């Protein structure tokens, strides 16, 4: 028997819905074919957006969507993607597969996608190969409600009212594909760019996010905060879970050993250390204003599926990935006092995707189901939680058998999310809710073998199911199957 303790009277704050953000890049089949098929397509669509994909994403209550990259962002010139499609410039996507990019999906199309999904837009601007003027013009084009050259151009392209885009990333991975910059050089650029990213309405202030560190590059965070911390609202962090150190042989998404399973989970758990250490640096230099941490790229990264373009980053998605998602989201929930946003990579057909498509077919991944099961945390009050765990040791890589987070809705109901990381043993759990008076409990579970996944031929191999649970005087009891994620909703 394992114990989960939740203290209803202790909280670090409200869970920002943006922690459940998504990311879509002009990469492989994420945008084209995955989301956007064009109005002439035989695949049912609304203004070019796949109806099936949009419907599935709406069910997740997606709060914010990052675009157009990724590495693509620092080669993207936004004017190439506005105006009549027949006049748009065709370019080569040099970062991802060397394919032709016709720019038929640009600013207006992306905002239409956000409108259909019901989410905020997060634009990643071009610092690597763009100019301050170009970036400044993009903000004006999107957000100026009065009379100006950019606002007039937007209206000429069919959008009278401003888009009021709130979130703006000042470059992407400036230490790498975004310009191979030193931290000192980027920090000065960030401060310069920030100066010209203006607010055009007191009711719609923009939120500026600096290009942050890769993994444990604490020098980067320190330098950016020290030199440009007063010019931004958040600093980003990128951390991918990669089973093997060799990027040419990262490991298979579906064919992996027990050792690789636990290595993947062990590396995922390192996210907490990274969040805490980068946050400590941010707080040291933020002064009298609060600067957040935006984990705007995270997720698993494996070798691509056989016989697919290596530049498309297409990979399958198993119960192992579901556990990775659950661990990360639990960590983000429990650090919601500092994490203002997180964006899993990526939404469709790329890396740890929510959705896979093949022609007119669509399949929901185990990761999709985790986001659906966890959506009740969005905007809720985080609650202090603790799991009494047993360490699972595999080649000196210890992994706890349980990983949890909890929150409380405005109506008093409590959501407890718990992952059983043990791939062979079920865990009977007793959850004690200190300060609560439970009157009822319902539960769902996502479970399966670590390599279990959904395919186009068998799309419901891994789907949520009801979980038997019993109410107690101060909580509930249940048994978590091996390799599973469960959600418990407790009414009071």
PLM regions: where:
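Non-catalytic accessory regions flanking glycosidase/transglycosidase catalytic cores in CAZymes
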Residues: 1-234, 268-272, 276-304, 308-492
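Histidine-centered catalytic micro-motifs
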Residues: 237
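Active-site His/acidic residue clusters
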Residues: 240-262, 308
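Gly/Pro-rich active-site loop or hairpin
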Residues: 265
């Amino acid at each position: 028997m394992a114990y989960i303790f939740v203290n209803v009277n202790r909280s670090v704050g409200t869970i920002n819905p943006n922690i459940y953000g998504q990311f879509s890049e002009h990469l492989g089949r994420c945008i084209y074919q995955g989301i956007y098929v064009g109005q002439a397509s035989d695949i049912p669509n609304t203004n070019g957006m796949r109806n099936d994909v949009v419907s599935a994403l709406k069910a997740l209550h997606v709060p914010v969507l990052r675009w157009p990259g990724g590495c693509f962002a620092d080669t993207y010139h936004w004017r190439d993607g506005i105006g009549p499609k027949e006049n748009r410039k065709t370019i080569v996507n040099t970062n991802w597969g060397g394919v032709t990019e016709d720019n038929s999906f640009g600013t207006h199309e992306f905002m239409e996608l956000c409108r259909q999904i019901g989410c905020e837009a997060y634009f990643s601007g071009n610092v690597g190969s763009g100019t301050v003027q170009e970036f400044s013009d993009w903000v004006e084009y999107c957000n100026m409600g009065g009379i100006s050259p950019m606002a007039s151009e937007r209206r000429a392209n069919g959008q009278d009212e401003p888009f009021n885009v709130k979130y703006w990333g000042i470059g992407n991975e400036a230490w790498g594909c975004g310009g191979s910059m030193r931290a000192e050089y980027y920090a000065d650029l960030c401060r310069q760019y920030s100066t010209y990213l203006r607010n055009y309405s007191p009711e719609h202030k923009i939120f500026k996010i600096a290009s942050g560190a890769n993994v444990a590059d604490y020098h980067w965070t320190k330098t950016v905060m020290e030199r440009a911390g007063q010019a931004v609202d958040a600093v980003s962090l990128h951390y991918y879970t990669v089973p093997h150190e060799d990027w040419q042989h990262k490991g298979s998404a579906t064919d992996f050993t027990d050792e690789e399973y636990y290595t993947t989970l062990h590396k995922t758990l390192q996210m907490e250390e990274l969040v805490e250490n980068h946050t400590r640096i941010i707080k040291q230099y933020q002064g009298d204003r609060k600067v957040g941490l935006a984990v705007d790229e995270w997720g698993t990264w494996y070798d691509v599926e056989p016989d697919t373009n290596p530049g498309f980053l297409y990979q399958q998605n198993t119960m192992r990935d579901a556990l990775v998602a659950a661990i990360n989201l639990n960590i983000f929930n429990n650090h919601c006092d500092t994490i203002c946003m997180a964006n899993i990579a990526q939404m469709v057909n790329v890396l740890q995707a929510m959705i896979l498509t093949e022609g007119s077919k669509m399949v929901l991944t185990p990761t999709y189901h985790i986001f659906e099961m966890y959506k009740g945390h969005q905007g809720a009050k985080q609650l202090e939680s603790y799991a009494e765990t047993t360490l699972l040791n595999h080649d000196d890589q210890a992994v706890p058998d349980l990983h949890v987070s909890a929150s409380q809705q405005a109506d008093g109901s409590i959501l407890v999310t718990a992952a059983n990381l043990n791939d062979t043993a079920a865990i009977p759990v007793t959850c004690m809710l200190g300060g609560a008076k439970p009157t009822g409990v319902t539960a769902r579970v996502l479970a399966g073998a670590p390599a279990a996944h959904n395919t186009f031929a068998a799309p419901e191999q891994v789907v949520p199911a009801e979980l038997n649970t019993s109410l107690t005087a101060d909580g509930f009891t249940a048994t978590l199957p091996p390799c599973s994620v469960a959600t418990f909703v407790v009414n009071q």
